[in-house]
């Protein structure tokens, strides 16, 4: 039997930003028994000795007091280090480009946090993500948020039935300008706070400086695939496929791009032209596969896919190799498919799940991304 809202406890993850603030406000207005939780995942004292998490938590406290809900701070630093940051470093060490947001959602927000919330007697958890959950045809489905520009299902691709059955996304039917307006109308302390961007544990810091604190940089040669040396690179971990800026190659003609990495020889491959064929792949092997539905998949099916956040949907054919591996055949060649990143699958508005890009091929030949 369904509980009434006032009998339903919803524990919401609050970051100190406007999105989670408005999500908490909406739940409170809908009559739920709401508790705000601030997740401290990282000891993020910046160069000036200021802990930005303290500022964010103060904003959470102010908003929770404004809307009249209790709040707590919970420390997940150990879990975050073990499950997210260690993965982040391991991927860079392997010459890949990881997506820590996907792993944070999988291991922290919808695992450690969800378990903590259930221990507090929660019926549901909620977050400020732009996504929707619907119960249709006897199972939970994850749908894109109605704000195309802000939809975050790409980062939620590792969720499954268990998590979705206990999750609310109060912002899924709203667009960002509406959320700002609601925050202003309610006089919330975070109404005009700017959105955070980039990787949460790096913040405003220089990426190279941050990474070099944890991984020793190994400078090497930057060259074309034919062997023409174009300069030196600072360390393969600092570059991603399709990157243009920061290469330091002068001269006339088309701009230069990163087209590959040779980890064994510590070579960064570069070539000219945005539409250089070396940047285009038409077949992908991906692992760490997760399907939102528990129902058996066809051995081969058509859908659309995103190979990076905010990319247009691309038509693909997915072939199931085994429980943890899939082959993806692209209808058209796609630029700068990057090992380590997530590939996420859709059927219209429904997010079907996702996987991690491992190998990229063009016309049956493996691209020299991680030779």
From Swiss-Prot:
Q: Region entry Interaction with target base in tRNA: which residue ranges?
A: 99-101
Lineage, top-rank taxon, reads Bacteria
Q: What is this protein called?
A: tRNA-specific 2-thiouridylase MnmA
Matching Gene3D superfamilies: Adenine nucleotide alpha hydrolases-like domains, HUPs, Translation factors
InterPro entries (alphabetical): MnmA-like, MnmA-like_C, MnmA-like_central, MnmA-like_central_sf, Rossmann-like_a/b/a_fold
Please give the chief subcellular localization of this protein.
Answer: cytoplasm
PANTHER family per UniProt: MITOCHONDRIAL TRNA-SPECIFIC 2-THIOURIDYLASE 1, TRNA 5-METHYLAMINOMETHYL-2-THIOURIDYLATE -METHYLTRANSFERASE
Site described as Interaction with tRNA, located at 129, 341
Binding residue positions for ATP: 13-20, 39, 128
For this UniProt record, the keywords arranged alphabetically read as follows: ATP-binding, Cytoplasm, Disulfide bond, Nucleotide-binding, RNA-binding, Transferase, tRNA processing, tRNA-binding
Q: Where is the active site?
A: 104, 200
Does the entry feature the keyword tRNA-binding, yes or no?
yes
User: Which family would the database say this protein is a member of?
Assistant: Belongs to the MnmA/TRMU family.
GO CC term, one of those recorded: cytoplasm
Organism placement in taxonomy: Bacteria, Bacillati, Bacillota, Bacilli, Bacillales
General function of this protein: Catalyzes the 2-thiolation of uridine at the wobble position (U34) of tRNA, leading to the formation of s(2)U34.
| Organism listed in the record | Bacillus cytotoxicus (strain DSM 22905 / CIP 110041 / 391-98 / NVH 391-98)
| Subcellular location(s) of the protein | Cytoplasm
UniProt-listed Pfam families: tRNA_Me_trans (PF03054), tRNA_Me_trans_C (PF20258), tRNA_Me_trans_M (PF20259)
| Disulfide topology | 104-200
Q: Where is this region: Interaction with tRNA?
A: 150-152, 308-309
**E.C. code:** 2.8.1.13
UniProt entry tagged with the keyword ATP-binding: yes
Q: GO MF terms on file?
A: ATP binding; tRNA binding; tRNA-uridine 2-sulfurtransferase activity
- Any one Gene Ontology BP term: tRNA wobble position uridine thiolation
Recorded catalytic activity of this chain's protein: S-sulfanyl-L-cysteinyl-[protein] + uridine(34) in tRNA + AH2 + ATP = 2-thiouridine(34) in tRNA + L-cysteinyl-[protein] + A + AMP + diphosphate + H(+)
